[in-house]
Amino acid sequence: MGLKEYKFGFESENIAVKFLKSHGYEILERNFHSRFGEIDIIAKKDEILHFIEVKATSKNYETAYRITSYKFSKILKTIKFYITKKQNETDFQVDFIGINKEKISFIENISL
């Protein structure tokens, strides 16, 4: 990934964080890494952990289509690792934020 793509991704995640905070989410972690993968944002709202995948584009296509079953399985493995590491047994869900030319789409509790 080049510097331009890195900056675009970082700024997109900043937009997502501002969106989540404005909707009452507490941001716990950003870019949580494990050997299985990465979670872009981990947040909490109403005692539920939210593991949020952020995808952004400046082109005309639907960002949600970029989450494949392979990517989703990596997200789930990383969630298991996070919960085990933090010894935090609580309800959780996987959410998605898509950013397309300043338009934000928020899809809660996704599954494949």
From Swiss-Prot:
Span of the signal peptide: none
Entry's Gene Ontology molecular function annotations: nucleic acid binding
Domain of life assignment: Bacteria
Stretches assigned to coiled coil: none
Database matches in SUPFAM superfamilies: Restriction endonuclease-like
InterPro entries in the record: Restrct_endonuc-II-like, tRNA_endonuc-like_dom_sf, UPF0102_YraN-like
HAMAP family membership: UPF0102
Family from the record: Belongs to the UPF0102 family.
Name listed for the protein in its UniProt record: UPF0102 protein CHAB381_0216
Organism: Campylobacter hominis (strain ATCC BAA-381 / DSM 21671 / CCUG 45161 / LMG 19568 / NCTC 13146 / CH001A)
Lineage: Bacteria, Pseudomonadati, Campylobacterota, Epsilonproteobacteria, Campylobacterales
